[in-house]
Swiss-Prot record:
Official protein name in the record: SPARC
Entries under InterPro entries matching the protein: EF-hand-dom_pair, EF_Hand_1_Ca_BS, Fol_N, Follistatin/Osteonectin_EGF, Kazal_dom, Kazal_dom_sf, Osteonectin_CS, SPARC/Testican_Ca-bd-dom
Gene name of the encoded protein: Sparc
Domain Kazal-like, residue spans: 87-149
Molecular function in Gene Ontology: calcium ion binding; collagen binding; extracellular matrix binding
Gene Ontology biological process terms from the UniProt entry: bone development; cellular response to growth factor stimulus; heart development; inner ear development; lung development; negative regulation of angiogenesis; negative regulation of endothelial cell proliferation; ossification
Higher taxonomy: Eukaryota, Metazoa, Chordata, Craniata, Vertebrata
Protein's organism: Rattus norvegicus (Rat)
Sequence ranges assigned to domain EF-hand in this UniProt record: 259-294
Job description of the protein: Appears to regulate cell growth through interactions with the extracellular matrix and cytokines. Binds calcium and copper, several types of collagen, albumin, thrombospondin, PDGF and cell membranes. There are two calcium binding sites; an acidic domain that binds 5 to 8 Ca(2+) with a low affinity and an EF-hand loop that binds a Ca(2+) ion with a high affinity.
Keywords: Basement membrane, Calcium, Copper, Disulfide bond, Extracellular matrix, Glycoprotein, Metal-binding, Secreted, Signal
A matching Pfam family: FOLN
């Protein structure tokens, strides 16, 4: 639990600086979007950016004419721009050896075949060379950090995961609300929802709480958790916004959580009740104990 609290304080605290630093951080760089100006209002600063996982996105070209045609020709992760014989820009696989040398362990990533790469650049460059192959199709970035032993998730542990996750989502929103003044961390509609949670005297403060207390608090203060669960769904449902979460859309939340919470993968797998590889809002909310009558698409704001 202490890891969750540390994760919350450090990353939610990053929200104060994040709106102006996104484009400079490789780990949060968008694959297909040109220069970013900051976190969208109401975005979750805790999850890594969706662009890190958009492996199938198309390259884009700006209409601005440049002396170097490659200057405004943007390639997805793992590819770089080169000019062909007719001076036309094209995206080709990047040589992994051309990736910047990693600064530290925090830049390393682990693939779903349990191989550690020096950075996301090295991973995507390698994946690009496998395009069109069965191995390349199955290869994905699993989580941030070097590969480590992930213990099996026991049934008893699986039941505890949503207790901590719900409490964490609530605390992330409250922290954003408290630090929102002048920072546009939340939209006005989101502020109105979170204000009620923040001002409720019965709210359980962030802390290293036993799961028994978290379970009792959810039962006593159930209404406080309805919006945070919907809010997080909306943060992930972005490409496209269709009311379903794909593996790629879940990745920005899964990747930083797996090293700390070994039940992360199994939890999200159990949420997919119909095994269609997508998690609908109803499945997501149900996984967190939200009653069917309280699941409301209008709360995904």
């Amino acid at each position: 639990m202490r890891a969750w609290i540390f994760f919350l304080l450090c990353l939610a605290g990053r929200a104060l600086a994040a709106p102006q630093t996104e484009a400079a951080e490789e780990m949060v760089a968008e694959e297909t979007v040109v220069e970013e100006t900051g976190l969208p209002v109401g975005a979750n600063p805790v999850q890594v950016e969706m662009g890190e996982f958009e492996e199938g996105a198309e390259e884009t070209v700006e209409e601005v004419v440049a002396e170097n045609p490659c200057q405004n020709h943007h390639c997805k992760h793992g590819k770089v721009c080169e000019l062909d014989e007719s001076n036309t820009p094209m995206c080709v696989c990047q040589d992994p050896t051309s990736c910047p040398a990693p600064i530290g362990e925090f830049e390393k990533v682990c693939s779903n075949d349990n191989k550690t790469f020096d950075s996301s650049c090295h991973f995507f460059a390698t994946k690009c060379t496998l395009e069109g192959t069965k191995k390349g199709h199955k290869l994905h970035l699993d989580y941030i950090g070097p590969c480590k032993y992930i213990a099996p998730c026991l049934d008893s542990e699986l039941t505890e995961f949503p207790l901590r996750m719900r409490d964490w989502l609530k605390n992330v929103l409250v922290t954003l609300y408290e630090r929102d003044e002048g920072n546009n961390l939340l939209t006005e509609k989101q502020k109105l929802r979170v204000k009620k949670i923040h001002e409720n005297e019965k709210r359980l403060e962030a802390g290293d709480h036993p799961v028994e207390l978290l379970a009792r608090d959810f039962e006593k203060n159930y209404n406080m958790y309805i919006f945070p669960v919907h809010w997080q769904f909306g943060q992930l449902d972005q490409h496209p916004i269709d009311g379903y979460l794909s593996h790629t859309e879940l990745a920005p939340l899964r990747a930083p959580l797996i090293p700390m919470e070994h039940c992360t993968t199994r939890f999200f797998e159990t949420c997919d009740l119909d095994n269609d590889k997508y998690i609908a809002l109803e499945e997501w909310a149900g996984c967190f104990g939200i009653k069917e009558q309280d699941i409301n698409k209008d709360l995904v704001i």
